[in-house]
Amino acid sequence: MAYDGLFTKKMIESLQDLVSGRIHKINQPENDTIIIVVRQNRKNHQLLLSIHPSFSRLQITNKKYDNPFDPPMFARVFRKHLEGGFIQNIRQVGNDRRVEIDVQSKDEIGDTMYRTIILEIMGKHSNLILVDENRKIIEGFKHLTPNTNQYRTVMPGFEYEAPPSQNKLNPYEVSGQEALKYIDFNSGKISKQLLNTFEGFSPLITNEIVSRRQFMTQDTLPEAYDEVMAETLLAPVPLFHKNHETGKEDFYFMKLNQFYDDIVQYDSLNDLLDRYYDARGERERVKQRANDLVRFVQQQLQKQQNKLSKLIDEYESAKDKETQQLYGELITANIYRIKQGDESVTALNYYTGEEVTIPLNPTKSPSVNAQYYYKQYNRLKTREHELDHQIQLTKENIDYFSNIEQQLDHITVDDIDDIRD
């Protein structure tokens, strides 16, 4: 969880340039994403608020989004209350991943009104809520009723309540020496105790504190804690890191000892997030859509394999054409011995010297029986050529779908669309 409370603090600091900016437009390009276009210093800034379970965040994005022709109801509510308004304040609640944006706007008759956007970044429980000046909920993206949530209600008309407090401490209000009071060196991992004690900490930052000293003692822990917390107050250094051993990707706003092999520095936190979440979003979209594609590919592969089996069986049967031709020839050669009504004739196969018994249609004349076998020969000969062509095409289809099945881990959304087409 790289977008922790400390990262949120840095992001809020970087967004202060938007204060006094005018809300020009509001869009909802994706189900869980709102884009607020803020006009400031004669330039438009896209403020992204996402409550995606895996990608929830707040940032300015330079990515271009396609907006639906008919905006969702949630976007319409935001437009009604916020468009044309001015941002008065952007603040973080404590050191948590909760952000509040105060907006001064005007209602339909021109009277001044005050609204607050509340973004709660909590993974799958993330929410986006709009409240009035009395903290009454106007609308929430995720409605929580007393029947579905025992802690609070998020419904229009109800007073806003914050998520249940975990009673954690703000790490910026606690020194390293004071932090010792909450750590038991005999009660398990120090990093986990730090995580459970301090608001806004993530495993990334608690592991960093522990890694700053070879051993954690009553002397080294306060030193490492103060050292890391002091560095979080410096100007941000937006870094992207990929661990080549595990393949895991991370980002943060400062240099970490854990980032040691492949590191890329970006010009801003927003550029960093665009790169990180765009790549992750692509993989997530691929994963979601690939589930259907996997089933489709497997079904097609099975279908083609079954088809090939039937074609091969039919092809083997078509090889019997030479027998049909032989029967026609032998009936013609022995036609003087055959009369209508005979059910079979035994004749000498002049190719092998063996006798052959040939079935006859007793209702037909000897010449009609001979023509029947000649027609069978010609039909099977033509069919054999058709089957040979179909078998080759089917084998190519099997190779095609087999290759797709092997490459699904590296496929893109565009590739999926191409395959579906």
Region locations from a protein language model:
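Extended, highly charged segments
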Residues: 1-421
